[in-house]
Amino acid sequence: MLLAQRRLISLGCRSKPIKTIYSSSKVLGLCTSAKMALKFKNAKRIEGLDSNVWVEFTKLAADPSVVNLGQGFPDISPPSYVKEELSKAAFIDNMNQYTRGFGHPALVKALSCLYGKIYQRQIDPNEEILVAVGAYGSLFNSIQGLVDPGDEVIIMVPFYDCYEPMVRMAGAVPVFIPLRSKPTDGMKWTSSDWTFDPRELESKFSSKTKAIILNTPHNPLGKVYTRQELQVIADLCVKHDTLCISDEVYEWLVYTGHTHVKIATLPGMWERTITIGSAGKTFSVTGWKLGWSIGPAHLIKHLQTVQQNSFYTCATPLQAALAEAFWIDIKRMDDPECYFNSLPKELEVKRDRMVRLLNSVGLKPIVPDGGYFIIADVSSLGADLSDMNSDEPYDYKFVKWMTKHKKLTAIPVSAFCDSKSKPHFEKLVRFCFIKKDSTLDAAEEIFRAWNSQKS
């Protein structure tokens, strides 16, 4: 046994030495743990990537009394036929076993049919489509399969937060270009007001540029890139022989007056583009974690190599159910009841409600043209953040304060920025509106009570 001496200090008392007895095995264990921690520290490829906005803010929203407009998941019900197809699949014995590693045959066939119509070209279900563990898995496959250490990858700011760490884990260098808002002169502020400078974008291309990551409709802004903007990007990709990884998970969620254009359909782009889609966003089933990549066989085969040596395959009954759900809506694509048509109509009403609500309490929302998020400038609320961590950006402090004191949560927009750009976005927070009316009612109550306290 080992003896150690400590001093006990208490208010109003003189300190006295006390003896603590430690077992030698405990001391040895502590020393061994310290050595092990030093020896088996993190791999360099994940250095500095341990902070994650979803881990941090999902914990805050776990309190059932908090109205959660933060993380982007629906609390509305998915279509009944989607759930019914999953139930059917679960009762078919061979649907509970492994399926084809690159995508369940019925699902890749359905995706080939759907996107063949959209692209107006034949898409080989086995060679030009890869089903992965969500859009995250599709992004990971794309970056690991196509990007080398030392390559540069262009990312527009703000960006979905996993882009930068995935690029860094591949040993590549992210090169950032900001989307900037045009002056609005007090008029309605929309995601269309945010764009890039074509000359500035061209200046980011170099001999080291391997790829550009595009996100349309955009998260968090809700921007739907115009054909003209996409043509600028496409021309630069062709000129500099650059890949395009196009994250289009919100492709069906586009609102009145706007059209989603796939950059892969522009001249010279099919052969250099990986387009990523999501079952979670298409059918409001984010917990299914199914995504897909579509592109030419000479690119998809490298993504397949990553997948076969990592995720290997995705859940068979989920893929089988998704295939059947797609066939139901493929057959009625011109029908208002088709979920690809009915969901954006439903969400546009919710979006407009959120815009009115945010305006009514003195906030300045950026009206999204697509997706299911709305950003608002919260600086006018004048919240007292003195009890928050002073080292954090304003939006982090604000959301934590709002969650604690108002029982309403959102996501800080600076989480979607590189370190240099964070100060330009830290007065903005992102709200999710793919929620039941009762959830939005509760949020409205909180905002109205808050506003009445100010006046």
Swiss-Prot record:
Gene3D superfamilies: Aspartate Aminotransferase, domain 1 (3.90.1150.10), Type I PLP-dependent aspartate aminotransferase-like (Major domain) (3.40.640.10). The modification N6-succinyllysine is found at residue 117. GO terms for cellular component: mitochondrion. Disulfide bonds: none annotated. Keywords: Acetylation, Aminotransferase, Lyase, Pyridoxal phosphate, Transferase. GO terms for biological process: 2-oxoglutarate metabolic process; amino acid metabolic process; biosynthetic process; kynurenine metabolic process; L-kynurenine catabolic process. Kynurenine transamination is competitively inhibited by cysteine, glutamine, histidine, methionine, leucine, or phenylalanine. Its cofactor is pyridoxal 5'-phosphate. Optimum pH is 9. SUPFAM superfamilies: PLP-dependent transferases (SSF53383). InterPro entries: Aminotransferase_I/II_large, Kynurenine-oxoglutarate_AT, PyrdxlP-dep_Trfase, PyrdxlP-dep_Trfase_major, PyrdxlP-dep_Trfase_small. Homodimer. Belongs to the class-I pyridoxal-phosphate-dependent aminotransferase family. This is Kynurenine--oxoglutarate transaminase 3. It comes from Mus musculus (Mouse).
